[in-house]
A protein has these predicted regions:
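A short helix->beta-strand "capping" segment at the edge of beta-propeller domains
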Residues: 26-46
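A short beta-strand motif characteristic of beta-propeller blades
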Residues: 36-43, 80-96, 131-143, 187-197, ...
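Short loop/turn segments that connect beta-strands within beta-propeller blades
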Residues: 74-78, 126-130, 182-186, 225-229, ...
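Conserved beta-strand positions in repeat-built beta-propeller and related beta-rich domains
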Residues: 61-67, 114-119, 161-173, 213-219, ...
Length: 267
């Protein structure tokens, strides 16, 4: 009975599971029936989320064109704390580069990694003193067309970035890529096509659950094998229109929409 369910398209309450025929087994899967809207950005902040990150305790939310500002969501109480430290804002803007707008963030021990929305720089901030310690500058493609870093994850050894290139005459397999980065050199040591989504939409989400990468684009959630870049499974979350951030806290995926909404998807 289970195999029959996995080999068919399951659609319940506006949610769909799209199985990959190459998949042999699934390790642990989200409980898609329990997807829940849990928070909205505070009204005093621009309602445009660019990325999410989990710091080991709470969920961090960065703002698109927010000049380094961010907010922290308490997972237990769902209360917000809005950043008011200019040193933090300055460091984020410095690493994000063009237009001072982060497109992806993730925590790696005592480092906060930031990728610019316009793909011109990425690097990390030492969270002990909030200095922009390392910045890797330069676009991934030497091309005048717009590019963007739109989601970051740390797997314990490497940084992963969801990258978008606004060359719409090319197939998405060339313009939407998952980049594997050596954190010491900033060099790309692996490249895989991202699951397809809206060609001209740079909003993404990317995170690591200890075994797999998770990627969100539009309404489509994908789990990805980091060794091969193969999509293991996909879930269509109809309630989410324009995902812009993804974070894993050990129990659930937190999903941001560009319009300021925060969703929680338990496993």
């Amino acid at each position: 009975m289970k195999s029959m369910l996995l080999c068919s398209l399951l659609t319940v309450a506006g949610l769909s599971f799209l199985p990959n025929p190459k998949t042999k087994s699934l390790i642990s899967n989200p409980n898609i029936l329990e997807l829940k809207l849990v928070a909205q950005l505070p009204a005093e902040l621009p309602q445009r989320i660019s990325s999410l990150a989990y710091d080991g305790k709470n969920i961090w939310v960065t703002i698109y064109h927010g000049r380094g500002h961010y907010a922290v969501l308490d997972r237990s109480t769902l209360d917000w704390k809005i950043s008011d430290d200019d040193k933090h804002h300055k460091a984020i803007k410095e690493v994000a580069g063009a237009f001072e707008s982060p497109g992806g963030v993730c925590f790696a021990k005592d480092r906060l990694w930031v990728g610019g929305s316009y793909g011109e720089s990425f690097g990390y901030i030492n969270t002990q003193d909030w200095t922009a310690t390392q910045i890797f500058k330069g676009k991934y493609r030497n091309d005048p067309a717009s590019q963007g870093y739109a989601g970051m994850a740390y797997d314990g050894d490497h940084i992963w970035i969801a990258w978008h290139w606004c060359r719409y005459n090319l197939p998405t397999s060339q313009t939407q890529l998952l980049l594997k980065i050596d954190p010491e050199t900033g060099k790309v040591i692996g490249e895989y096509p991202l699951p397809e989504g809206t060609p001209n939409d740079v909003t993404h989400g990317l995170t690591w659950d200890g075994t797999r990468l998770w990627h969100m684009k539009d309404s489509k959630l994908s789990s990805i094998d980091p060794a091969s870049g193969e999509v293991i499974a996909q879930y269509y979350l109809r309630q989410i229109r324009r995902a812009s951030g993804l974070a894993w806290d050990g129990e659930a995926l937190w999903i941001a929409e560009f319009n300021g909404k925060i969703w929680r998807l338990p496993f």
